[in-house]
Amino acid sequence: MVDLKTKAFDIAQNFTISLDGPAASGKGTIGLILAKKFALKYFQSSIVYRQLAFNCIHQQIDITDIDAVIALSQELKLDNNIDLENEDIGDIASKIAVISEVRNNLNHNLINLVKTTPRIIMEGRDIGTVVAPDADLKIFITASPYVRAVRRYNQLQAKGKTCILDEIIQQIILRDKRDKERKVGPLLPALGAFIIDTSKLSAIEVVEEVTNYIKNKIT
């Protein structure tokens, strides 16, 4: 059996990391740094839900029409030329993500991607519990709602987008509630996950903690 340290640092080995956590916990930044450090393909699973949300808006589909949303999820194709980093799109994505059939349809594609990619880090809400339960390393990161809201606020401000901090805080609290209470793939740490609170840590510090965990993990 190949140990975790060898899988991580030997690029000839297959290596899968699941990176889960709530909205704006720092998953994206941390995931990209880890991907570069360990020569992994990085994939953000929320993109498929945001793409579906965008398609619902573009095709004027009422998201309360469950059958229509499910049908649209069966033929989803990603468009890399679209800016999906929008709070309205994110809010709709969170709402349609609670639909069991939608999650099953989109997760099928995500599972195939994990299985066919030798070295990958996939980031989301239920990667370690549903999409890649056999991942070599399962990470769950979190932070307080206020800290996460400030991070999201700063991200949007940097992009020149108008936003109100209090509204972002409420959106994050509501999104957390939906994520934790949905029937399929609720937000929770996977069994055996390395759990990190990033409230007082920079992305680099989190990566250092993950690296030390890998080096010292006894399998």
UniProtKB/Swiss-Prot annotation:
Signal peptide: none annotated. The keyword tRNA processing does not apply. Its EC number is 2.7.4.25. Keywords: ATP-binding, Cytoplasm, Kinase, Nucleotide-binding, Transferase. It catalyses: CMP + ATP = CDP + ADP; dCMP + ATP = dCDP + ADP. It is found in: Cytoplasm. One of its GO terms (biological process) is pyrimidine nucleotide metabolic process. ATP binds at residues 21-29. The keyword Protein biosynthesis does not apply. GO terms for molecular function: ATP binding; CMP kinase activity; dCMP kinase activity. Pfam families: Cytidylate_kin. GO terms for cellular component: cytoplasm. InterPro entries: Cytidylate_kin, Cytidylate_kinase_dom, P-loop_NTPase. Belongs to the cytidylate kinase family. Type 1 subfamily. NCBIfam families: cmk. This is Cytidylate kinase. It comes from Rickettsia typhi (strain ATCC VR-144 / Wilmington). The lineage of its organism: Bacteria, Pseudomonadati, Pseudomonadota, Alphaproteobacteria, Rickettsiales. The gene is cmk.
